[in-house]
A protein has these predicted regions:
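N-terminal beta-strand motif that seeds the catalytic metal site of vicinal oxygen chelate
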Residues: 1-22, 70-75, 123-135
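Core segments of cupin and vicinal oxygen chelate
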Residues: 2-6, 12-55, 89
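Short Asp/Glu-rich motifs
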Residues: 45, 106-107, 129, 133
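Short, charged, solvent-exposed linker or helix-capping segments at domain edges/interfaces
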Residues: 51, 86, 120, 129-133
């Protein structure tokens, strides 16, 4: 099996007012947030462009369910389907749902403390069309 997790794909958390939170982070920390939050670009060990997403969610979101927590981590993975099968065999709670978009494939698991974890097999190039070339 390839490497399981290759990095942090995103940090997602609930807030009372996502727009105000994005404004605060922009003003005080320089985040350039859009409707989805802020994308941080970096290079992986092979020198490929990679992205990590920071996203505040409304506090009434159901996206983090079945977890009751106010946050969710997203981890970048090399092979989502293979990893989910392996985790299922290891007894990990795998949420029976997968989604695919032009920017990657997603699956979800729940850790031993009830935290929902999003697993993302990214296609970082899909984001580059919207990003300036100076990053």
């Amino acid at each position: 099996m390839k490497k399981r997790v290759t990095g942090i794909g995103g940090v997602f958390f609930k807030t009372k007012d996502p727009d105000k939170v994005k404004e605060w982070y922009n003003k005080h920390l320089g985040f350039n947030a859009d409707d989805y939050g802020c994308s941080f670009w970096w290079k992986d060990i092979e020198g490929n462009d990679a992205m990590t997403q920071w996203s505040p969610f409304p506090e009434n979101t159901d996206y983090f369910e079945p977890s009751k927590k106010d946050f969710m981590m997203n981890f970048r993975v090399e092979n989502l389907d293979e990893l989910l099968e392996t985790l299922k065999k290891e007894g990990v709670q795998v949420i029976d749902k997968k989604e695919s978009y032009e920017y990657g494939k997603f699956g979800w698991i729940v850790d031993l403390e009830g935290n929902k974890i999003e697993l993302w097999e990214p296609v970082d190039q899909a984001f580059k069309q919207d990003e300036p070339d100076d990053k």
